[in-house]
Amino acid sequence: MKLRVAAAVLVIALAPLLLQTPYWRGILIVCAMNVLLALSLNLVIGYTGQLNLGQAAFFAIGAYVSTILTKTHGWNFWLAVPVAIAAAGLLGLALAAFAVRLRGHYLAIASLGFAVITYQVLINWERVTEGVRGIYGILPPPGFRDQLALFYLVAGIAVAVYLVLDNLVRSPVGETLRAIREDEVSAASLGINAARWKAFAFGLGAAIAGLAGCFYPGFVGTLVPEAFNIVESFTMMAMVIVGGMGTMIGPVIGAVVLTFLPELLRSIGELRLLVYGLALTLVVLFMPGGLVQLGAALRRKRS
């Protein structure tokens, strides 16, 4: 684990030196946010087996709450962040209170419905959100106005969240979550309150997505509902699946690959969508454990 953290710190330190143009440094910031989002969703689907298709809603809640507090009400950004995290986490718990007793496709439909409702609220509650017109002129956090500083901030937060979650899943809490994922009935027979622990994972995942959302508006400078449509939720899920859900490093790998792959394929125009889709299909069909499974197989072959 120490080796992984050291490698991550080295990559974070060197990446902006290798990718010095504003465009690529912007991609690095997006990648760091995507790592946060993938980690947040992996806690829910990878460790408790809950099929959540509404994670983009919590990303949006963090973005809008922090922006409305800072831009409309004049709050300090660093005071708005914990409020935005709490708002996303509490709404995640509220949804979980109704949804955790659902399983499989029913939970997927319920979470998808929540994402659609959130999206419609952002469009139609114009007095607060400005609707489809959006909110403009949003600045990055104070002290992190240039791209390099913002990247190091978001990447540092992503590393911190990784360490917290890694310790969590290695603890008895992680064992409890995995027991629920493998067999909820057997877990209940051991005295585990599955609904309570699933709600905990759902709420914590929502809070982390809300944290990622706090940094998105300052990066792009604008905030519009279209940035949080259902495609965003499916993109997060693709990152987790491609990297390897139920592992800690898998979602990080998936986020990096699926952030940079579309950019590297941009030179082939519309064909990039075909290549991108084909790559995803091949991973799902032949490596159900994701790229982590491929890495493990290569290590075994070498040994």
Residue spans of the language-model regions?
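Transmembrane alpha-helices and adjacent helix-loop boundaries
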Residues: 1-303
